Structures are given as structure tokens and as C-alpha cells.
Amino acid sequence: MTEKYIVALDQGTTSSRAVVMDHDANIVSVSQREFEQIYPKPGWVEHDPMEIWASQSSTLVEVLAKADISSDQIAAIGITNQRETAIVWERETGKPIYNAIVWQCRRTANICEQLKRDGLEDYIRDNTGLVVDPYFSGTKVKWILDHVEGSRERAKRGELLFGTVDTWLIWKMTQGRVHVTDYTNASRTMLFNIHDLDWDDKMLDVLDIPRAMLPQVRKSSEVYGQTNIGGKGGTRIPIAGIAGDQQAALFGQLCVKEGMAKNTYGTGCFMLMNTGEKAVKSENGLLTTIACGPSGEVNYALEGAVFMAGASIQWLRDEMKLISDAFDSEYFATKVKDTNGVYVVPAFTGLGAPYWDPYARGAIFGLTRGVNSNHIIRATLESIAYQTRDVLEAMQADSGIRLHALRVDGGAVANNFLMQFQSDILGTRVERPEVREVTALGAAYLAGLAVGYWQNLDELQEKAVIEREFRPGIETTERNYRYSGWKKAVKRAMAWEEHDK
């Protein structure tokens, strides 16, 4: 019998990846392609949907060729994706009517201000689990329909379709036969009622978005359709798992029980805590979102999103030219014993949880004559850990659960300095898994469970090997002293930009 594999497609903010996994959850082959970031105006971020598709489909062909695996050896494909990014395209031609508006894009801040003025904040929080912020898809879709001539009428006639990136990829992979999303992605649109598990008529009405353009919403682990892309001949492969990247990582870390949490250090930082079948309403600026239970069914989670994590290290490299490679940041940070009193607040696109201030801007505080580039590099790394503590404090207050260990993943977890400082500043154990590709793992697990490739999560439990554990190495007084300096710095970076700009 030929060995069968699972493929995870991981469509991220800066690159598209394909990962092949075997039955023991080992990574057999990986392929990755970066694509262009488009910045039409300050604070605006776009992608070309056709380039997203081209990069993702080519990685799929490439990853199979690399491993010398034929398409009939693929048991299923799972998809995980950058969330909230909004795409609108023509049903007939499959052609986008505008670029994808990316989750980081702040262009809809004025639409969000109007929603607040109209007194909708409580309704939105209670029903969608979200805060009013340009981050989510709903206001992005409204912006496209407002600015592309004739598009709203066409959407009403059923000629246009909306989707997050998962929906767009599946539409392309099935040649326009399947228009679908899953609960985790739908819960990020600000258009979805997370309690009724259906699109919210009031939100569609408020944002003037025709229901006809929305995808069908399904659970995260089931067969949605078939694709024969990248295959020799006509082998049809089931597409059987979908989850937004952060929910996929939560599942890949096997945080499927109430009170388990993970933090992903990518472009941004995303901490999620599974709250089981209970949708916990946050009083502390966190999001209530949908996650996956043990067999991909609906569970709820609390989430805190930090917009700038790895992106702030890229800023040190690309704009400030203080390092030539992101990996060098650890070396330079450890050349000094502390930050010499410096705090970097990387609020380049405003602040996420728990502050939610789109008008905050980046700042460096505490500069004195003795500060050198190493101090600034170290302070930038430390800012990632401080922002994570901001989120964890809010999470513990909302859930009433004291976290005993934080599971971590994402590119920046290779940085031992950052992981140790993270443990120091949280006063909590930090667990780094052996397999770092947990987002892809999550998508693969969801797809594999749907087609019976794996029977249940117990089979996967032993795959969750912790490679290294970091334990707090500083005293509580020192920890709190440093953290209070951070809070002071954040306060001063807030509300920098004028509201009416």
C-alpha cells in the first residue's frame, strides 16, 4: 500500500506555504513563496488576490514535486490563512474587483468611528465577540462596495462574492464550485453572530452588505469539496479542514481543553485561550472568538491581538538598518545587560489588545546620551514580551483562570533571549514545542480527522513534544518595576495621531 500524506496550505500575510505531513505528524516537505505587500497610502495595506492564489497554488505543486509524492498519495488538504483580510470578486469570471484589503489596513477607521457614534459598540461586542476596529473584515467589505462603482448593486444581484482568504482559495481550487468558509474565519468578519452561528442581519444592514455575497459557514473539520490542482491526471483530493491561522495554531498545539493557551509570535502576536463551550465576554478589551474543539466542532476562545511583534524586528532590519538579519537581534540584545532605561512602543499601526487605539503611534522613550543601538534592539525585543503580558493579564481577569504554562510558536520563538524574557516578565513557564509549524499542523490535523486519516486527537497527543521549557529568573519586585515602566511608555504613545486626519 502506498503511503498517504496530508498537505497543509498556510496562506500567511507575507508568504504562502505548503507543508506535507506523514501519519506520525512529521514534516516531509515544505515550500514557500513570498508575495508583494502593497502600501497605497500611509496605514493602508493591500495584497493582489491573484498573486495570493498564484503563490499558494505554485507552492502546492512544488511541495509535492520536492518530496516526489503524487497527488493520489494525498489523503486530504487542510487550509489555514491570514484572517480578516477581505476579498470581493466576480462570480462569473473569478476576477477580483479590488485588491484584498489586509487585516493590518487602517483605512476604515472613520467607518468605525461612525459605528461608535451610532452606539453600536455594545451590540457588536455582544453578538460578534469583537471590538469596533478597522482590523475586521466587515468595514473593509463596506469600503470596497462604497468605492468600486456599481459594486453594491451587482452584489445585490448575486454577481459578486465576498470571502476571507480561505474562501477565495477554495473557490479557486474548486473552479468556482464551492463558496464556503468555516466558523473560525466567519467569527472574524464582524458580520457573524457567534451565538446563533449565522450571519448577523443587523450588521449586514448597518454596513449595507448584501447577504447574497456571503459564503456558507461550515465546521472546521469536514469535506468541503474536491480539487485536482497540482496533480498529474485527474486525481481529486478532498479539501477537508479550514481554520484561521491563530485557531489552527491553538489546535496544532492541542489546546483543546478549557483554560489552555498559546501565543504565536509572527508578524503580530496572537494569544488565544480556549474557554470550551462557554463564550466568555471580555471586560478587558479582548475578543471573544470561535475556536476548535477536539473534533473541529465549535469551541470558544478569548483572544488578544498585538499588531507588531516580528514586524518590529523587520523594522529594525529594513527601515532602521540596525541589523542585517532578524536572527541577529538576539546576538545584539545580549551584548548589553539591560535596555539602559529605554522602552520601545512599536505602535506603528496603532495598538491592539487590550488598548485598541488606532491613533497611537510608535515611540522610543527614556533616551539618554549613553543609549546605543544594542539597547534599542533589546528594547524592541522586550516590547514583544511586554505586549504579551498586557494581553495575558486581561485574559486571566476575564476568564478567572490563572495560566500555569504558555505554549509558544511562530518564527520569533527561536530567539532564546526573547523566550527567557517572556517567562521572566510573565512569571510563568514558557513551553516551546519541538515541531514549530503548529499552524500548518492544526490545518493538517483538522483535514486528517475529517477523512479518518487520524481517528481522534489521542493519536496525536504524543506528537506534542516540548523541546525546551523556560522558567522565570527574576524577582517579582524587579518584574513589576520593569512592567510599570512599560505601562508609562504606552500611555504616552496613545492618541498621538489626530482623529480627524
From Swiss-Prot:
HAMAP family: Glycerol_kin. Key enzyme in the regulation of glycerol uptake and metabolism. Catalyzes the phosphorylation of glycerol to yield sn-glycerol 3-phosphate. One of its GO terms (biological process) is glycerol metabolic process. InterPro entries: ATPase_NBD, Carb_kinase_FGGY, Carb_kinase_FGGY_CS, FGGY_C, FGGY_N, Glycerol_kin. CDD domains: FGGY_EcGK_like. GO terms for molecular function: ATP binding; glycerol kinase activity; metal ion binding. It is an enzyme of class 2 (transferase). The gene is glpK. ADP binds at residues 13, 17, 267, 310, 411, 415. Disulfide bonds: none annotated. This is Glycerol kinase. PANTHER family: GLYCEROL KINASE, SUGAR KINASE. It catalyses: glycerol + ATP = sn-glycerol 3-phosphate + ADP + H(+). Pathway: Polyol metabolism; glycerol degradation via glycerol kinase pathway; sn-glycerol 3-phosphate from glycerol: step 1/1. Homotetramer and homodimer (in equilibrium). Heterodimer with EIIA-Glc. Binds 1 zinc ion per glycerol kinase EIIA-Glc dimer. The zinc ion is important for dimerization. Keywords: Allosteric enzyme, ATP-binding, Glycerol metabolism, Kinase, Metal-binding, Nucleotide-binding, Transferase, Zinc. ATP binds at residues 13-15, 267, 310, 314, 411. Sn-glycerol 3-phosphate binds at residues 13, 83-84, 135, 245. GO terms for cellular component: cytosol. The keyword Metal-binding applies.
